[in-house]
């Protein structure tokens, strides 16, 4: 749903710094990455490699591990920042480390500009986005990472889309969880787990799955 477009140099630098770090993470053999993934999936659910969500789930995990992991050595992004001598790359790393995951409703967007309303925190953002969001309609709900860099808010690398038409049900669920005192991170994990459920129960209306979040469903019948 997202295609690459030629952006400004700030966009290129921001994403290149993250891609370089993700590439380094792929060479990790300490067991830290595997342990972090297990913890991540305990919170959000385990996706199988043959499922459609495998790629966005994995990319979202890498972003979380790189910039939010609280292991003994701290987040890999923080470790990279400590050794970075280039001031522009260091600024980009700091922006990633200050970024936050968000569950947003997409507004009516124009080329390069995407309005996004954060359901968990209530904030409204005007996001600078050079990539084309094919098939994304106003009112769609997406989990994204919001990054403030060089005076602009930008999306991260990963987009986890929720089914079209589920926005009202998701907002109801988010309000219910906020009323229970749940944190934004807890709400994000919960709603992501519901998104995974829509893949496992394709014979069930997604709206029902979001509205009946605590309802026990039978095993998928393949229908």
Predicted regions and their residues:
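Short nucleic-acid-contacting surface segments enriched for D/E, G, S/T with interspersed K/R
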Residues: 129-145
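Accessory interdomain/linker segments of ATP-dependent helicases and helicase-like nucleic-acid enzymes
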Residues: 23-104
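Short, structured beta-strand/loop micro-motifs enriched in basic residues and often containing a Trp
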Residues: 119-127
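Short aromatic-glycine-enriched beta-strand elements
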Residues: 112-116
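C-terminal effector modules of nucleic-acid-centric enzymes and ribosome-associated factors
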Residues: 10, 18-30, 155-158, 168-223
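Short, charged beta-turn/beta-strand-edge "cap" motif at the junction between a beta-strand
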Residues: 145-152, 161
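A residue-level detector for short acidic-glycine micro-motifs
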Residues: 108-110
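Small-residue-enriched segments and motifs
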Residues: 104-106, 144
């Amino acid at each position: 749903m997202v295609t690459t477009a030629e952006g400004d140099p700030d966009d290129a630098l921001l994403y290149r710094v993250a891609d370089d770090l993700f590439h380094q993470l792929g060479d990790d053999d300490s067991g830290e990455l595997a342990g972090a993934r297990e913890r991540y999936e305990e919170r959000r659910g385990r996706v199988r490699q043959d499922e459609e969500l495998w790629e966005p789930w994995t990319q979202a995990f890498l972003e979380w591990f790189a910039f939010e992991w609280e292991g003994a050595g701290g987040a890999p992004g923080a470790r990279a920042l400590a050794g970075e001598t280039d001031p522009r790359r260091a600024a980009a790393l700091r922006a990633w480390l200050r970024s936050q995951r968000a569950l947003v409703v997409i507004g009516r967007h124009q080329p390069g500009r995407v309005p996004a309303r954060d359901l968990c925190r209530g904030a409204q953002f005007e996001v600078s986005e050079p990539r084309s969001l094919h098939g994304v309609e106003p009112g769609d709900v997406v989990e994204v990472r919001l990054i403030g860099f060089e005076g602009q808010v930008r999306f991260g690398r990963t987009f986890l889309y929720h089914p079209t038409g589920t926005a009202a049900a998701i907002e109801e669920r988010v309000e219910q969880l906020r009323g229970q005192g749940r944190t934004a991170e807890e709400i994000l994990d919960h709603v992501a787990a519901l998104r995974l459920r829509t893949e496992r129960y394709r014979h069930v209306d997604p709206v029902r799955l979001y509205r009946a979040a605590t309802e026990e469903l039978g095993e998928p019948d393949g229908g």
